[in-house]
Amino acid sequence: MAAERERGGRERSREREERDSEFVDKLVHINRVAKVVKGGKRFGFAALVVVGDQKGRVGFGHGKAREVPEAIRKATESAKRNLTRVALREGRTLHHDIAGRHGAGRVYLRAAPAGTGIIAGGPMRAVFETLGIADVVAKSVGSSNPYNMVRATFDALKHLDSPRSVAARRNIKVSTLQARRVGGDAEVVAE
């Protein structure tokens, strides 16, 4: 009985390690924060981490602790709890250009042809690398605060639509939608 319980615990931890190993995490920002107490200042650290599986799932988290490794661990756990799925075109770029905002920060994301790479600054680059996007052009305007930039990027990604979802919303075929996108003047077969 005890051996079964022990083995079960080991198997659960092994499953958890396998699940966690599929994720890539990037530390975006670490900040030293201070709490003023009666005896002076008590210092701690706040960490912002982005986690993704490089296949279309990504999340970000924030963690605070007295030590840096503990803050990073808390932020990573928070990010894994807040994963969102993003539809990618050909598994490498966005389906369409989009803008997102949070606070005074705005970001503009543009789909890019193959071979372009990730042209984005700081916090946005971490989001795209963990998401699995290989080709994108991004510009941030306004606030350069890492928290605002990450949240604005997630706001933009949240409003991203795949052709399948657009076609379902409009009650048309995906092929009709794709023909309009590629050709512009291409003949569209009436349904």
UniProtKB/Swiss-Prot annotation:
Any one Pfam family match given in the protein's UniProt record, by short name: Ribosomal_S5_C
Signal sequence range: none
Region (Disordered): 1-21
Sequence ranges assigned to domain S5 DRBM in this UniProt record: 23-86
GO biological process: translation
CC annotations in GO: small ribosomal subunit
Domain of life: Bacteria
GO molecular function, one term: structural constituent of ribosome
Alphabetized SUPFAM superfamilies for the sequence: dsRNA-binding domain-like, Ribosomal protein S5 domain 2-like
Keyword rRNA-binding assigned: yes
Keyword terms: Ribonucleoprotein, Ribosomal protein, RNA-binding, rRNA-binding
Entry's free-text remark on domains: The N-terminal domain interacts with the head of the 30S subunit; the C-terminal domain interacts with the body and contacts protein S4. The interaction surface between S4 and S5 is involved in control of translational fidelity.
HAMAP family: Ribosomal_uS5_B (MF_01307_B)
Family affiliation: Belongs to the universal ribosomal protein uS5 family.
Subunit-structure text: Part of the 30S ribosomal subunit. Contacts proteins S4 and S8.
Its job: With S4 and S12 plays an important role in translational accuracy. Located at the back of the 30S subunit body where it stabilizes the conformation of the head with respect to the body.
Protein name: Small ribosomal subunit protein uS5
